[in-house]
Protein backbone atom coordinates (compact mmCIF):
# COMPACT_ATOMS: atom_id res chain seq x y z
CA UNK A 1 0.00 0.00 0.00
CA UNK A 2 2.79 2.42 0.91
CA UNK A 3 4.69 1.56 -2.26
CA UNK A 4 1.61 2.27 -4.38
CA UNK A 5 1.13 5.67 -2.72
CA UNK A 6 4.79 6.55 -3.25
CA UNK A 7 4.58 5.56 -6.91
CA UNK A 8 1.44 7.65 -7.46
CA UNK A 9 2.98 10.70 -5.77
CA UNK A 10 6.17 10.31 -7.83
CA UNK A 11 4.24 10.13 -11.10
CA UNK A 12 2.17 13.19 -10.19
CA UNK A 13 5.30 15.13 -9.21
CA UNK A 14 7.10 14.27 -12.45
CA UNK A 15 4.05 15.20 -14.52
CA UNK A 16 3.77 18.54 -12.75
CA UNK A 17 7.46 19.27 -13.34
CA UNK A 18 7.13 18.53 -17.05
CA UNK A 19 4.12 20.81 -17.39
CA UNK A 20 5.86 23.65 -15.57
CA UNK A 21 9.00 23.46 -17.71
CA UNK A 22 6.94 23.20 -20.91
CA UNK A 23 5.12 26.44 -20.08
CA UNK A 24 8.38 28.22 -19.19
CA UNK A 25 10.05 27.35 -22.50
CA UNK A 26 7.12 28.39 -24.69
CA UNK A 27 8.11 31.12 -27.17
CA UNK A 28 11.85 31.06 -26.42
CA UNK A 29 12.88 29.53 -29.74
CA UNK A 30 13.51 32.63 -31.83
CA UNK A 31 14.71 31.45 -35.24
CA UNK A 32 12.93 28.15 -35.80
CA UNK A 33 13.17 28.21 -39.62
CA UNK A 34 16.90 29.00 -39.56
CA UNK A 35 17.57 26.14 -37.18
CA UNK A 36 15.63 23.73 -39.37
CA UNK A 37 17.57 24.56 -42.56
CA UNK A 38 20.91 24.49 -40.78
CA UNK A 39 20.12 21.14 -39.22
CA UNK A 40 18.98 19.73 -42.57
CA UNK A 41 22.11 20.84 -44.40
CA UNK A 42 24.35 19.34 -41.72
CA UNK A 43 22.47 16.05 -41.47
CA UNK A 44 22.30 15.34 -45.22
CA UNK A 45 25.12 14.95 -47.66
CA UNK A 46 23.93 16.93 -50.62
CA UNK A 47 25.61 18.92 -53.35
CA UNK A 48 25.18 22.61 -54.04
CA UNK A 49 24.31 24.32 -57.32
CA UNK A 50 26.75 23.59 -60.14
CA UNK A 51 28.18 20.44 -58.57
CA UNK A 52 28.43 17.20 -60.54
CA UNK A 53 25.57 14.78 -59.87
CA UNK A 54 23.77 11.67 -61.05
CA UNK A 55 20.02 11.61 -61.72
CA UNK A 56 19.71 8.25 -60.00
CA UNK A 57 21.42 9.37 -56.76
CA UNK A 58 19.17 12.35 -55.80
CA UNK A 59 22.12 14.10 -54.20
CA UNK A 60 21.34 17.74 -55.06
CA UNK A 61 20.22 19.87 -52.10
CA UNK A 62 17.83 22.33 -53.71
CA UNK A 63 17.89 21.66 -57.43
CA UNK A 64 17.28 18.62 -59.56
CA UNK A 65 20.11 17.03 -61.49
CA UNK A 66 20.09 18.01 -65.16
CA UNK A 67 22.92 17.42 -67.63
CA UNK A 68 25.12 16.10 -64.84
CA UNK A 69 24.95 19.30 -62.74
CA UNK A 70 22.79 20.41 -59.82
Swiss-Prot record:
Signal sequence, start to end: 1-22
Its biological purpose: Omega-conotoxins act at presynaptic membranes, they bind and block voltage-gated calcium channels (Cav).
Residues of the site described as Important for calcium channel binding: 58
Cleaved propeptide residues: 23-45
Compartments in which it is found: Secreted
Protein name: Omega-conotoxin-like Bu1
A GO MF label: calcium channel regulator activity
